[in-house]
């Protein structure tokens, strides 16, 4: 989980919260906002549909102010989720999300002109759907994240 920054056409800054499942490579959250606080992150996470209706064991994050909030800590504690903090100044500790953010920057944020926050969110949603449904990943055997999840669920069902 990480944050990115960009600007609307008029120069007004906004943030994008990104959350990706490292196992399936599925983009779970792309949420835009002018100001996203720790309380907002906890509320957004409450609404995330994690695969298999199960919460992750851990979420890897950096030491940004949004991630060291009491609200996020409480949310994670109540769900027995470990918040795994990367070392300050070491983006390589969370290389997967940094790589994902690079793709998001190159393919969505840098190629679009955002007229409003709603326009930015709509374009982020379209990019996320494309990423999850139509983009195969070599690390997933050239399946899309959605195909990989579907195959994983079918394998689990067939084992019982």
Q: What do these predicted ranges mean?
A:
Residues 1-28, 34:
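An active-site-proximal beta-strand-loop segment
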Residues 31, 58-62:
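Short catalytic-loop micro-motif centered on adjacent basic/acidic residues
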Residues 8, 12, 30-54:
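Active-site beta-loop-alpha junctions of metal-dependent nucleic acid enzymes
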Residues 26-30, 84-86, 110:
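Short small-residue beta-strand/loop micro-motif enriched in glycine and branched aliphatics
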Residues 79-81, 106-160:
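C-terminal domain-tail junction helix/linker
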Residues 61-63, 69-73, 83-105, 117-125, ...:
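RNase H-like two-metal-ion nuclease catalytic core shared by retroviral integrases
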């Amino acid at each position: 989980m990480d944050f990115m920054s960009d600007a609307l056409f008029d120069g007004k800054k906004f943030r994008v919260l990104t959350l990706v499942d490292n196992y399936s490579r599925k983009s779970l959250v792309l949420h835009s906002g002018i100001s996203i606080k720790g309380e907002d992150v906890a509320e957004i996470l409450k609404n995330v549909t994690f695969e298999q209706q199960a919460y992750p064991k851990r979420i890897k994050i950096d030491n940004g102010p949004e991630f060291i909030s009491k609200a996020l800590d409480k949310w994670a504690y109540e769900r027995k989720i470990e918040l795994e903090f990367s070392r300050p100044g070491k983006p390589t500790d969370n290389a997967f999300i940094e790589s994902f953010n690079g793709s998001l920057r190159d393919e969505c944020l840098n190629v679009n002109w955002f007229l409003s926050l709603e326009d930015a969110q709509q374009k982020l949603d379209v990019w996320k759907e494309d990423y999850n449904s139509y983009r195969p990943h070599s690390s997933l055997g050239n399946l899309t994240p959605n195909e990989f999840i579907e195959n994983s669920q079918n394998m689990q069902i067939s084992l019982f």
